[in-house]
């Protein structure tokens, strides 16, 4: 689809900015604020753990991840194949950018959403995670702030923490052919942001606010996070943590056998 291709090009441009400015460093700091909204904590369930949950826990518990190299390759390939990858060569290197198909489906249906992204530059470099915020409406909002409310916390992201200017576009929504406006912003994911994504997945209710606050006449739009976002975040977290904890050889074998779409420069 044309629009998905345009979005992929935008996301890949973000990856290029990261590669040229950060080199091999995945630990890039970006400002964010997290406000405690409630002290209530929901009880954990006995459901089977996702790979990212295991890998975020104590070191001795990571033994639950397969020790056999070929099994590690298979698990990493499965996680990577749950994400749609886009490949582009650029001056000085190349990159793979991965986004869950759930995010692309949200876009096609005109649903404002969170867009978790994984950027891969090769087996010798740790992956980089990004968070995108995609607002789709009837008119441009000139978005400068995004708020995410979970059961326990409010996460606020201002435009000073975005790594590029807010990108604007127009798209046609299926199946009625309605024309909508789209605004997207991206930021590097810090450790706090990864914690926030886990909180979002685990929260029973998640509200999104897309706002223009840097004005005497503020404008904002509130909506519920699409349910598909939970799977999208889970897909990217699994791919990110499995890749992060894999050896260079396992990474290379997994990357050699995944599908991707080449993006024209």
Feature map (PLM): residue ranges:
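A generic "folded-domain core" signal
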Residues: 23-265
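Bacterial N-terminal signal peptides that target proteins for export
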Residues: 1-11
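C-terminal motif of bacterial Sec signal peptides marking the signal peptidase cleavage site
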Residues: 17-21
């Amino acid at each position: 689809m044309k629009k998905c291709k345009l979005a992929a090009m935008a996301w890949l441009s973000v990856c290029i900015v990261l590669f040229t400015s950060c080199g091999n460093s995945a630990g890039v700091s970006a400002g964010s604020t997290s406000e405690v909204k409630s002290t209530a904590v929901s009880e954990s369930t006995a459901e089977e753990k996702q790979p990212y949950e295991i890998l975020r826990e104590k070191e001795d518990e990571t033994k639950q991840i397969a020790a056999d190299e070929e099994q590690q390759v298979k698990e990493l390939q499965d996680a990577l194949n749950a994400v749609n990858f886009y490949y582009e060569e650029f001056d000085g290197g190349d990159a793979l950018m991965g986004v869950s198909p759930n995010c692309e489906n949200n876009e096609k249906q005109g649903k404002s959403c969170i867009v978790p992204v994984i950027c891969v530059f090769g087996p010798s470099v740790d992956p980089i995670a990004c968070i995108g915020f995609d607002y789709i409406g009837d008119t441009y909002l000139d978005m400068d702030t995004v708020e995410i409310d979970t059961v326990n916390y409010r996460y606020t992201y201002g435009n000073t923490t975005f790594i590029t200017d807010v990108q604007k576009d127009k798209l046609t929504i299926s199946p009625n052919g309605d024309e909508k406006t789209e605004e997207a912003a991206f930021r590097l994911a810090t450790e706090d942001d990864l914690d926030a994504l886990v909180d979002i997945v685990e929260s029973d209710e998640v509200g999104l606010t897309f706002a223009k606050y840097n004005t005497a006449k503020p404008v904002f739009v509130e909506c519920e996070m699409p349910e598909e976002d939970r799977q999208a975040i889970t897909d990217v977290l699994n791919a990110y943590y499995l890749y992060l904890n894999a050896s260079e050889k396992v990474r290379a074998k997994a990357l050699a056998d995944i599908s991707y779409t080449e993006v024209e420069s």
